[in-house]
Regions:
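Interface amphipathic segments
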Residues: 1-392
Length: 392
């Protein structure tokens, strides 16, 4: 496989130099004077130096520094034998700093498109992290990551009762400010100047919570005058979930500059239990509303979609009330049956073909029709009524 593969490590040119080695019971001391190696992937460690020390009470790594031709990392840590014996007592303190060069980032990430490798900034990824505590209470006292010119990320959190599957909990808060992230669009193998663009100067606030089997997440993205807000939760024991998405005045043209799509305001809410939609015990409910979408010369609004799943029967309703389209549609489908079993009823009271650019001039009367369809095992029935015209 391309890049570094932890399941296939083949080392060569290994050099190790140790000094002041001492070990007796809990008393230990070792000074790493020299360590270097090369991996088959191209990853190279040019230097690893540091010291490990322990006595009857404490275990220390006063300094451990690793260098590659493109990166450097250093770690300091201290803990107590008490933590080793009883992980919920004692205390661990650790600090980690790293500057990871482009070559090593791409190597560790594995097989990536050539367009992404070319577009990725030629600057080091700077990471700083710190933690204090034990498995009963662990604090993430500091965390930051920065790729100069691309993004800066900071955060912290708290982890509680990590060994207790029922009582464990976690709180993680992250803040991100973006600059030029357009190189990420090359992950799909296309050049960064293609149809999709990631705008500059976006802000992202994310909060994650866990309590036992319950997981919760909140996300707020701001881009210019636009905003995207997501609030979601999932219970791993009951498979109950909910999600609320609100988009307010988000300028999609900033993301798709070569398209004619502009401002979007919409909301989506979902709640349910179970993820096997063919099961009679699964329930789900969805409600979506399009308040405003500017596409080309069209201003689209007044569209609502609702849907439910209960007893393996999916039902959906679509209502459109705007200048382009006035209609009501209802549909249902049996999800658990091995054959097609569903029906559709569509009632269009006004379809403006002239405004849509299909008809050369306004129609004397608006186009209106009713369409119904049923699928029963291996047979499909359809019926269309438009004025005096009826088709089966």
């Amino acid at each position: 496989a391309e890049g570094f593969d932890p399941s296939h490590i083949a080392l060569r040119d290994i050099r190790i130099g140790l000094d002041s080695m001492y070990y007796r019971g809990r008393n230990m001391n070792a000074v790493i004077r020299e360590f270097s190696m090369n991996d088959r992937s191209g990853l190279s460690v040019t230097s690893l130096t540091g010291r490990v020390f322990a006595n009857d009470t404490i275990i220390q790594v006063p300094s451990l520094k690793l260098l590659t031709p493109h990166s450097e990392m250093d770690l300091t840590a201290q803990t107590y034998w008490e933590l080793v014996n009883i992980p919920t007592t004692g205390r661990l303190t650790a600090r980690f700093n790293a500057m990871i060069g482009k070559q090593d980032v791409l190597l560790l990430a594995g097989g990536l498109p050539d367009s992404f490798k070319e577009a990725y900034p030629f600057r080091p990824l700077v990471i700083r992290a710190g933690t204090e505590g034990n498995l009963k209470e662990m604090q993430i006292t500091r965390f930051s990551a920065e790729l100069p010119g691309a993004f800066s990320l900071s955060g912290g959190g708290e982890l509680l009762n990590l060994t207790d599957s029922l009582e464990r909990s976690a709180i993680i808060d992250l803040r991100m400010q973006t600059q030029n992230l357009n190189f990420l669009t090359a992950l799909g193998g296309t050049r960064p100047d293609s149809l999709l663009v990631i705008p500059n100067q976006m802000s992202l606030v994310a909060k994650a919570r866990m309590k036992g089997p319950q997981y919760m997440a909140q996300l707020l993205l701001k881009e210019g005058e636009g905003m995207l807000n997501l609030d979601a939760a999932y219970n791993g024991s009951t498979e109950a979930y909910r999600a609320d998405l609100k988009v307010d005045a988000l300028q999609l043209h900033h993301f798709l500059p070569k398209d004619s799509i502009y401002e979007l305001t919409t909301s989506v809410a979902a709640v349910g239990r179970g993820i096997d939609f063919t099961s009679y015990r699964t329930t789900a409910s969805l409600k979506a509303s399009l308040q405003s979408l500017h596409y080309g010369r069209y201003q689209i609004s007044g569209i609502e979609v609702t849907g439910d799943v209960k007893n393996a029967l999916a039902t959906a309703r679509l209502v459109s009330d705007n200048r382009l389209l006035k209609m009501n549609a209802n549909a249902e489908y049996h999800l658990a049956k091995p054959y097609m079993d569903g029906k559709l009823d569509m009632d269009v009271t006004q379809l403006d073909l002239y405004e849509l650019g299909i008809a050369p001039k306004p129609l004397k009367y608006p186009l209106a029709f009713n369409f119904t369809a049923e699928a029963r095992r291996d047979r499909i029935f359809t019926h269309l009524t438009a004025g005096d015209m009826k088709l089966n």
